[in-house]
């Protein structure tokens, strides 16, 4: 790798935070909060709540949840109340992916500036950043919910670069989603590490790896 790099900018969800483990932990919290509605053994309800997290699927998932619980004559909170509570419960139960904390600590000790650039609702993303335990490690954080643009708009990448005090050539962006993370970094002129299990670089990323731990060998 080009050792002129001075900063590493991370995506959050699916890059540092383990979505699956976080949803599982959040569902257990919902079971504790609403023991009459949710049960840890009810896998269908858990999957419907996961679908419900994505607002584009929320209405259909809510109806499906109502149908699923109907035989037990149970009444869900209103769609808006449940969407808000489930979203914040998920955010407050963020679980890091393997090697995430170790890698960020490694980069910090090596003197790299560390940035975070994430799309999403401001309140939820900030709650997630704090709950995952990495907040003190970042030199600069950009949440799209606080801005008039989001990934893959090059403008939000430039905002991250400016906050870190580096140029595009001096940064590496790390993410798991082609359309937002990798394409956006490319448009902004930033080298990228695509986290994927694929062996073929179909995204046109600068580097490929299965997890963020690869950075300890790249940098």
Model-identified regions with their sequence ranges:
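A short, structure-level motif marking secondary-structure boundaries and short turns
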Residues: 46-50, 87-90, 110-111, 141-143, ...
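Short, acidic loop-to-helix structural element flanking the phosphoryl-transfer center
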Residues: 88-114
């Amino acid at each position: 790798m080009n050792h002129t790099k001075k900063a590493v900018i991370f995506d959050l969800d699916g890059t540092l935070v383990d979505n699956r483990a976080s949803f599982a932990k959040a569902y257990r919290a919902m079971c504790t909060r609403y023991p009459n509605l949710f049960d840890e053994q009810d896998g269908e309800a858990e999957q419907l709540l996961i679908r419900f997290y994505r607002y584009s699927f929320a209405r259909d998932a809510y109806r499906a949840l109502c149908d699923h619980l109907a035989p037990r004559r149970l009444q869900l909170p209103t769609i808006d109340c449940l969407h808000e509570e489930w979203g914040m419960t998920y955010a407050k139960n963020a679980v890091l992916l393997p090697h995430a904390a170790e890698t960020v600590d490694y980069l910090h000790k090596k003197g790299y500036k560390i940035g975070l650039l994430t799309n999403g609702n401001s309140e939820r993303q900030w709650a997630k950043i704090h709950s995952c335990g990495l907040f003190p490690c970042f030199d600069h954080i950009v949440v799209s919910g606080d801005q008039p643009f989001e990934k893959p708009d090059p403008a939000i990448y430039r905002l991250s670069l400016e906050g870190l005090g580096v140029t595009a050539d001096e940064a590496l962006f790390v993410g798991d989603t082609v359309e937002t993370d990798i394409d956006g970094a490319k448009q902004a002129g930033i080298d990228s590490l695509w986290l994927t299990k694929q062996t073929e670089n179909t995204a046109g990323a600068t580097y490929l790896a299965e997890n963020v731990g690869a950075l300890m060998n790249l940098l």
